[in-house]
Structure formats: structure tokens, C-alpha cells
């Protein structure tokens, strides 16, 4: 999965897809626990416009057009949407409300109340393992609305918190248990594109866990990767996805000797909730 990073304005969608992305990541900013804008703000990755934005409902409806056969904008390659939920300042109760409201808005504007809605898989990326109630609120809302089937298309990622330290894999696993999540688990690791690479120790530990007999992780992605050398290292370690500001760079590496025979772009037929090789 090549994940176009920080795609928050409608005009950025085709740009990222034309460069080779088959997945997109959006930043969802909340107002009174309601998803209101796709917006990141400053600071953000180097060489990027941090203040591009759109109303969330408009963006979700546009994503539906890009991922529903029959629309003029439909792009078969776009198979995964990662919603980076900016809920870091919420307590668990507020996060639950945010989960309820996110479910309602996606149901209405992206899934079109399950009537010819968007077909892409969805990952909810949550910034704090303490906010496990967000997932509960999201899942219970879709069930209450009579659309539990849509949960087959939804996965989850706890990305933090970053301070004072990132949670351990055991702590992350415990948060998923509290949220009632078994399977459909993505794990992210990485830093901004201007940060030093480091030794990828946490990434390697996560991949080892993913591949173990009792691992709880299904897929792992690394961000924000813009340099050829970093892409090569991430692929050699064994990531499932790469989040990038330059999808064409990833495409180039995938075509290199040593990689083109081992990796290919994911398609809609590849289940993002299945651990490769298991």
C-alpha cells in the first residue's frame, strides 16, 4: 500500500493518485467532538503546505466519488483510506462521542447509508491508546444504525501517544482488547520526513510480532518516507505499507532489481486485515 500523506484538500486527491498512490491519508480535525475539517496545520512535514483543508462532509462525499464504480471520478486503484483522527486533547468520554459522530458522518457522506457507497477499506488512526472508547462508540453506532456489515471494511491503528514515550506493543495490544478489537489491526511507526532515520528498532520489533504465531498485528506501515534509501530499508525490513509525500518515489523503488520480484502494489482483492503468509 502506497499511502499518499496529508491529502486534505479535494484538489490533492487526483494529484496523489496520479503519482501512484493506492491509498490516501487525511487529517480529521474536530470541533465539539464532531469531525469538521480535513486539516493538519503547522508544523507538518518539510516542503509541504500544512494549511490545505476542506469541510469533512465535502471531502467524504468526494472520496465516495473516487471509490464508487459508475462515478466519473472513480479510480479503481484507490482501495484504502486512512483517517488520522486529531483527538489527542480529548478525554476518553469525549473520544467516544467523537467515534459516534465519525461513524454517523462516514455512514451518511461516504457510505451513503450503505446504498452504493464508497468501496474502499477504511483505517481509523487514533493518536492515544487511552482513547479506546472511540472505537467502541464508532462500532456501536454502526450496529445501532443497522449497518454492522460495514465494520468488515474498517480497521484500526493506535499511533501514540508520542510523549513521554511511545506505548509498548503489549500496551497497544491491551488497548485493542479494551476496545473489543480482534483482527483488523494496523500499526504505524515513523517520524516526520525531516527526522533522522534511526535504527528502526520499534519497527523491527513490530514486524517480528506481526509474523509470530500469536501476533495481534495484521499490517504495518512506516511514515513519512520520501527518500529512496529509506524506502529500500523499510521494504527490506518487511513493511506492508509506506506513507509518503512522493508516491512516485515508492513506485520507482518497487521497479528496482531486488524489489520488483518480491513486492507489488496491493489491489482491491488483497484483504488488508489478513497477515501476509499466515
From Swiss-Prot:
Its signal peptide is none
Domain of life, per lineage: Eukaryota
Q: Name one GO biological process term.
A: killing of cells of another organism
GO CC annotation, single:
extracellular region
Q: Say which enzyme class the record assigns.
A: lyase
CDD domains membership: GDPD_like_SMaseD_PLD
- Tell me the active site: 5, 40
> Could you tell me where this protein is found in the cell?
Secreted
Catalytic reaction annotation:
an N-(acyl)-sphingosylphosphocholine = an N-(acyl)-sphingosyl-1,3-cyclic phosphate + choline; an N-(acyl)-sphingosylphosphoethanolamine = an N-(acyl)-sphingosyl-1,3-cyclic phosphate + ethanolamine; a 1-acyl-sn-glycero-3-phosphocholine = a 1-acyl-sn-glycero-2,3-cyclic phosphate + choline; a 1-acyl-sn-glycero-3-phosphoethanolamine = a 1-acyl-sn-glycero-2,3-cyclic phosphate + ethanolamine
Q: Which family does it belong to?
A: Belongs to the arthropod phospholipase D family. Class I subfamily.
Q: What does this protein do?
A: Dermonecrotic toxins cleave the phosphodiester linkage between the phosphate and headgroup of certain phospholipids (sphingolipid and lysolipid substrates), forming an alcohol (often choline) and a cyclic phosphate. This toxin acts on sphingomyelin (SM). It may also act on ceramide phosphoethanolamine (CPE), lysophosphatidylcholine (LPC) and lysophosphatidylethanolamine (LPE), but not on lysophosphatidylserine (LPS), and lysophosphatidylglycerol (LPG). It acts by transphosphatidylation, releasing exclusively cyclic phosphate products as second products.
Annotated protein name in UniProt: Dermonecrotic toxin Ls4SicTox-alphaIII1ii
Which source organism does the UniProt entry give?
A: Loxosceles sp. (strain 4 GJB-2008) (Recluse spider)
Amino acid at each position: 500500500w502506497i499511502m499518499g500523506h496529508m491529502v486534505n484538500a479535494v484538489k490533492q486527491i487526483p494529484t496523489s493518485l496520479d503519482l501512484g498512490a493506492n491509498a490516501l491519508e487525511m487529517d480529521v480535525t474536530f470541533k465539539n467532538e464532531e469531525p469538521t475539517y480535513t486539516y493538519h496545520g503547522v508544523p507538518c512535514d518539510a516542503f509541504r503546505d500544512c494549511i490545505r483543508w476542506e469541510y469533512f462532509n465535502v471531502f467524504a462525499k468526494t472520496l465516495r466519488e473516487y471509490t464508487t464504480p459508475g462515478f466519473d471520478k472513480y479510480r479503481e486503484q484507490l482501495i484504502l483510506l486512512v483517517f488520522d483522527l486529531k483527538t489527542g486533547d480529548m478525554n476518553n468520554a469525549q473520544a467516544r462521542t467523537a467515534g459516534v459522530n465519525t461513524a454517523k458522518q462516514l455512514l451518511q457522506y461516504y457510505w451513503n447509508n450503505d446504498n452504493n457507497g464508497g468501496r474502499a477499506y477504511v483505517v481509523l488512526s487514533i493518536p492515544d491508546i487511552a482513547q479506546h472508547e472511540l472505537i467502541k462508540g464508532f462500532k456501536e453506532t454502526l450496529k445501532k444504525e443497522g449497518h454492522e456489515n460495514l465494520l468488515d471494511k474498517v480497521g484500526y491503528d493506535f499511533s501514540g501517544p508520542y510523549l513521554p514515550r511511545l506505548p509498548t506493543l503489549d500496551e497497544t495490544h491491551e488497548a485493542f482488547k479494551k476496545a473489543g478489537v480482534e483482527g483488523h489491526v494496523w500499526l504505524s511507526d515513523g517520524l516526520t520526513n525531516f527526522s533522522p532515520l534511526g535504527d528502526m528498532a520499534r519497527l523491527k520489533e513490530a514486524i517480528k510480532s506481526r509474523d509470530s504465531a500469536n501476533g495481534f498485528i495484521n499490517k504495518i506501515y512506516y511514515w513519512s518516507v520520501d527518500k529512496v534509501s529509506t524506502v529500500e530499508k523499510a521494504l527490506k525490513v518487511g513493511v506492508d505499507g509506506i506513507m509518503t509525500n512522493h508516491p512516485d518515489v515508492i513506485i520507482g523503488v518497487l521497479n528496482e532489481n531486488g524489489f520488483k520480484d518480491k513486492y507489488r502494489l496491493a489491489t482491491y482483492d488483497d484483504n488488508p486485515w489478513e497477515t501476509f503468509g499466515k
